[in-house]
Curated annotation (Swiss-Prot):
The protein's name in its UniProt record: Leucine--tRNA ligase
GO-annotated molecular function: aminoacyl-tRNA deacylase activity; ATP binding; leucine-tRNA ligase activity
Gene that encodes it: leuS
PANTHER family in alphabetical order: LEUCINE--TRNA LIGASE, MITOCHONDRIAL, LEUCYL-TRNA SYNTHETASE
Family according to the record: Belongs to the class-I aminoacyl-tRNA synthetase family.
Chain positions of motif 'KMSKS' region: 602-606
Pfam family, one: tRNA-synt_1
Record localization: Cytoplasm
Biological processes annotated in GO: leucyl-tRNA aminoacylation
Length: 834
């Protein structure tokens, strides 16, 4: 099998089979899988992702489209830097070696990529254009620098965006995240929050789950800001944001973020307050905040209620109010907010009900809508009515204003690492921040660099960061931070349109190819990569790099590949190939000791539940692996790896070869007529095409297996419909080609076809062949089913009437009389009224 696969891979390579032109009169189709990080080896998760995309690409090609199906490398990132530290090798050397290896692996799987368009994000000829783009953003005030409280990963020694912190830990290292103040570069994605939110409804070919995740991440909140005067210091105010301003008369405290500026100005920092603030520093984002026990500490500060000066509210530093949401301050209404209620119970604060409820709000918060009570001029109004009225009132009295807030924050792009795209800025003592001139791009990374695992090597480089200021020519310092690697993946799909363009994009090529028709990848990228790519596309549109404002028309998120986990008697993880199964028990191959089988989980290095793809490929071949990852589960669902399932796919491929040998030996003079087989061939063509279009690839494979069984069952018959068997087998080979391209090309050639299979059109079905010669009708008497009968297509209404009224099961109800009436539902029901 491997020889056949290598043969066809070489032919496709020699013929440049999947290279496409930007100048073509065919309709275009752009299918793209999320580009991989070049770790050195592709894994089964890659194979599943890319096999899905490959089926779509090959199918659309057979449907007559000009198909762009490119591949590239998201090559910057921490693993390369860690490998450099471990192996004393430059990250570039490690990365390019991995790229070469993985490119060969992808080719060995038979994926139909246009390798002439390959991009590598660590290539200066790629990233110089994103440096230029960053400078353009800076000129438009869409890129800026500020000191910010950031998520610091103490293992990777770098800053992480909020989206990269999962349950308080770094998404790569797993380290507990710390909070630090650092000068950082940001992109103003918040300027596009409203458009990013509004356009979600138009992404009709995206999964609802992803659209919902983006909506929640952007998190639009409409409410009001109130101005609370500080008691005994009425020149000072605390501005408070609330999404439920109508509950203002239920306020019992003001909650502020631990880093609210008023703490430094007006609040005495007692040791207790300092300790509390330190504890708050460990809460890294909204996801961890939701899980944390709500806590707070009283300050010496009090404020005056904006509508009732007799009400004095304490100011409490809390662990659940964030400075980067709203104003960093809230009014607490414990009766109608779960977080406020939890804190009020803990700190013995008043709980004042202002919405009618059928529960005791002292025991549990009532968070539903209702009628306002205990609320002065708002009494008797619904929540929405009260909300509008209170906003009008605070604006009239100038004690507040209507306000819209977003959960989405500006994107912090600074990373304190070496192996990334250098940020093209210079710091001069005379001129302050100075952009690198366009003519000096790209700013490249040095080759002579030392890695010791401590901080950013660019900070310690003896010469690289030292440069003369482009404005005054005096000594200056380069920015030593590099871009977040999501920067590279936020625009790469535009570069594929012409990867050799002499600007960021070739706009004419982008106008032809964009948007991407189908983008395929994991749902874990829903609120990072996909959101950033949408943001970049909008800005690139404004910079005249592209004409579209949304990058991906359709999105498909595939499930993960799972495998059982194993542990030895010492609780150490074991690889699957270290384990053998006997009598429904698992044993260590070497020691013979009993092994515990754990849960079936996502394949991961840490739990060793991986399979060696190269070994499997040598044993079973690429086609069998492709078929298995597509046939055993719907593509959007998780797939459990199974050697027995893989062996079944290998047997099916062997069966195809056997079927070819039988069919090749058949003589055309041995013939019969099998209308049912002919009908099944045409039905299979119809439904396989529909299944592929709907990504029901496992269902398509099941239909093709059914057709193969129907064809092979003819082999044992004395009188065989040879013509239909041969036609059906030719169709089967064509239908299977997008799934198992190597063996189908081989069989197609052996069948005597001159044209390459990948160049042929997808088979067409004949609608007239889908109909049966007969049909079954339900026979009712007075609306109740009494019998069924199979009629010929040619049967007239008169014949149907005569046959049905003479059926024995009908006759006993007629009792020798004529029916009063006969009602027909054509080809479905005949109802005899007696």
């Amino acid at each position: 099998m491997n020889q056949i696969e290598q043969k066809w891979q070489q032919i496709w390579d020699d013929e440049k089979a999947f290279e496409v032109s930007n100048e073509c009169n065919k309709p275009k189709y752009y299918v793209l899988e999320m580009l991989p990080y070049p770790s050195g080896k592709i894994h089964v998760g890659h194979v599943r992702n890319y096999s899905i995309g490959d089926v779509i690409a090959r199918f659309m090609n057979m449907q007559g489209f000009n198909v762009l199906h490119p591949m590239g490398w998201d090559a910057f990132g921490l693993p390369a830097e860690n490998a450099a530290i471990k192996n004393n090798v430059h990250p570039k050397e490690w990365t390019y070696s991995n790229v070469d290896n993985m490119q060969q692996q992808l080719k060995s799987m038979g994926f139909a990529y246009d390798w002439s368009r390959v991009i590598n994000s660590c290539d200066p000829q790629y990233y110089k254009y994103e440096q230029k783009f960053f400078l353009e953003l800076y000129e438009r005030n869409l890129a800026y620098q500020k000191e910010a409280l950031v998520n610091w990963d103490p293992v990777d020694n770098t800053v992480l965006a909020n989206e990269q912190v999962v349950d308080g830990r770094g998404w790569r290292s797993g380290a507990i995240i710390e909070k630090r103040y650092l000068k950082q570069w940001f992109l103003k994605i918040t300027d596009y929050a409203e458009e990013l939110l509004n356009e979600i409804k138009n992404l009709k070919e995206w999964p609802e789950a992803v659209r919902s995740m983006q909506e929640k991440w952007i998190g639009k909140s409409i409410g009001a800001n109130f101005y609370f005067k500080v008691k005994d210091n009425e020149d000072a105010i605390i501005e408070v944001f609330s999404t439920k301003p109508e509950t203002i008369f239920g306020a019992s405290f003001i909650g502020i973020a631990f880093n609210h500026p008023i703490i430094e100005k007006l609040i005495s920092k007692t040791p207790e307050i300092s300790n509390f603030i330190t504890k708050c520093l460990h809460i890294t984002g909204s996801s961890e905040l939701e899980k944390a026990e709500k806590d707070g500490i009283l300050t010496s500060l009090y404020v005056i209620h904006p509508f009732d000066p007799s009400i004095i509210l304490p100011v409490i530093i809390t662990n659940f109010v964030l400075m980067d949401y709203g104003t960093g301050a809230i009014f607490g209404c414990p009766a109608h907010d779960e977080r406020d209620h939890e804190l009020a119970v803990k700190m013995n604060l008043p709980i004042k009900q202002v919405i009618e409820a059928d529960i005791d709000v002292h025991k549990i918060a009532y968070t539903e809508d209702g009628i306002l009570i205990n609320s002065d001029f708002l009494n008797g109004l619904t929540n929405n009515e009260a909300k509008q009225k209170v906003i009008k009132e605070i604006e009239k009295l100038q004690i507040g204003k209507r306000s819209i807030n977003y959960r989405l924050k500006d994107w912090g792009i600074s990373r304190q690492r070496f192996w990334g795209c250098p940020i093209p800025m210079i710091y001069c003592k005379v001129c302050d921040i100075v952009p690198v001139p366009y003519k000096d791009l790209p700013v490249t990374l040095p080759d002579n660099v030392k890695f010791n695992g401590h901080g950013n090597p660019l900070d310690h480089h003896p010469t690289w960061k030292h440069v003369n200021c482009p404005k005054c020519d005096k000594p200056a310092i380069r920015e030593t931070d590099t871009f977040d690697t999501f920067f590279e993946s936020s625009w790469y799909f535009t570069r594929y349109c012409n990867s050799h363009a002499t600007d960021m994009t070739d706009k004419k090529a982008c106008d032809y190819w964009l948007p991407v028709d189908k983008y395929i990848g994991g749902i874990e990228h829903a609120v990072m990569h996909l959101l950033y790519a949408r943001f970049f596309t909008k800005v690139m549109n404004e910079q005249n790099y592209v004409s579209v404002r949304e990058p991906f028309k359709g999105l498909f998120t595939q499930g993960m590949v799972l495998h059982a986990t194993y542990k030895d008697e010492h609780n150490n993880w074991l690889y699957p190939d270290e384990v053998v199964k006997k009598d429904n028990k698992f044993f260590h191959k070497k020691s013979g000791n009993l092994v515990v089988q754990g849960r079936i989980e996502k394949m991961s290095k840490s739990k060793k539940n991986l399979i060696d793809l190269e070994t499997m490929q040598k044993q079973y071949g690429a086609d069998a692996i492709r078929l298995f990852v597509l046939s055993d589960s719907p593509p959007e669902k998780d797939l459990e790896w199974s050697v027995s399932g893989l062996e079944g796919c290998s047997r099916f491929i062997n069966k195809l070869e056997h079927m070819f040998k039988v069919i090749a030996s058949l003589k055309d003079d041995v013939t019969g007529i099998n209308k049912e087989l002919n009908r099944l061939v045409h039905l299979t063509i119809k439904y396989v095409a529909e299944d592929i279009k709907h990504f029901a690839l496992n269902r398509a494979i099941a239909r093709m297996r059914e057709l193969s069984n129907a064809i092979s069952s003819e082999f044992s018959k004395e009188v065989m419909d040879v013509k239909t068997v041969k036609y059906g087998f030719n169709v089967l080979v064509q239908l299977l080609n997008p799934f198992i391209p190597h063996i189908t090309e081989e069989i197609w050639q052996k069948l005597g076809n001159k044209e390459r299979l990948y160049k042929t059109a997808f088979p067409a079905f004949d609608e007239s062949m889908l109909e049966l010669d007969t049909y079954v009708m339900a026979v009712q008497v007075n609306g109740k089913l009494r019998d069924t009968y199979e009629f010929n297509n040619s049967a007239s209404d008169y014949e149907i009437k005569q046959i049905t009224i003479n059926l024995p099961k009908v006759q006993k109800f007629l009792e020798g009389t004529e029916p009063k009436k006969i009602i027909f539902v054509p080809r479905k029901i005949v109802n005899i009224i007696v």
